[in-house]
């Protein structure tokens, strides 16, 4: 919305949110088409990472019924991902004992204190919040099966894997969905400035790689 209004020059967004914005999906919070948006580059994938306390009894998406679950800040990319995955799995927020709209860090603290049973976090692999949780309590990473991903009906959601040992205690690969992130700008930004920004990023990939593990997925072919 800020880019559409010309109140910024660059943003990082999930592919499904970008599609919703471009098409004016009111259910996702976009009452008008954001037709001034322009793509700059693909970056890295967000992975749907649903993590439960090992003693919660949660092993599948269906087991989330009757449980206390955090889905990220309201209307955030993570929360939109949660809605899409739950709907495809035949679940709704009303099926849960409690839904919390909390940032990653706060969700983890509540799980440590046994005030939440599970959290859904859409982020790069090895996200710090889940690494922190996994060192404090035993966790289970809940799979998102391929048939659920297909039912979402959005090409932005791709079948992917959270590799074994991404988190402490996670000894097996876990199937999930991944959603690409894109850098976007708007039509009012001069082409020369867009070129310089893009060039600067790709000439400094080593710096990005050193700053964040997820950035290693950014390649020139993006």
Residue ranges and their predicted role:
Residues 1, 42-113, 205-206:
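Bilobed "Venus flytrap"/periplasmic-binding protein-like clamshell domains
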Residues 15, 26, 56, 93-190:
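Pocket-lining segment of extracytoplasmic ligand-binding domains
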């Amino acid at each position: 919305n800020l880019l559409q209004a010309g109140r910024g020059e660059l943003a990082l967004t999930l592919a499904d949110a970008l599609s919703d914005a471009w098409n004016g999906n009111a259910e996702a919070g976009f009452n008008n088409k954001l037709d001034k948006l322009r793509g700059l580059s693909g970056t890295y994938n967000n992975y749907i990472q649903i993590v439960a306390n090992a003693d919660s009894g949660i092993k599948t998406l269906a087991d989330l019924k009757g449980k206390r679950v955090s889905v990220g800040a309201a209307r955030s990319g993570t929360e939109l991902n949660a809605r899409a995955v739950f709907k495809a799995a035949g679940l709704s927020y009303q099926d849960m004992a409690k839904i919390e709209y909390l940032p990653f860090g706060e969700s983890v603290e509540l799980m440590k204190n046994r005030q939440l049973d599970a959290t859904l976090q859409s982020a790069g692999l090895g996200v710090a919040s889940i690494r922190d949780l996994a060192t404090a309590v035993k966790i289970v990473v809940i799979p998102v099966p391929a048939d659920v991903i297909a039912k979402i009906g959005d090409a932005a959601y791709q079948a992917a894997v959270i590799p074994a040992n991404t988190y402490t205690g996670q000894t097996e690969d876990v199937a999930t969905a991944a959603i690409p992130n894109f850098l976007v700008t708007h039509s009012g930004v001069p082409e020369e400035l867009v070129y310089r920004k893009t060039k600067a990023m790709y000439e400094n990939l080593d710096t990005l790689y050193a700053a964040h593990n997820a950035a290693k997925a950014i390649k020139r072919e993006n």
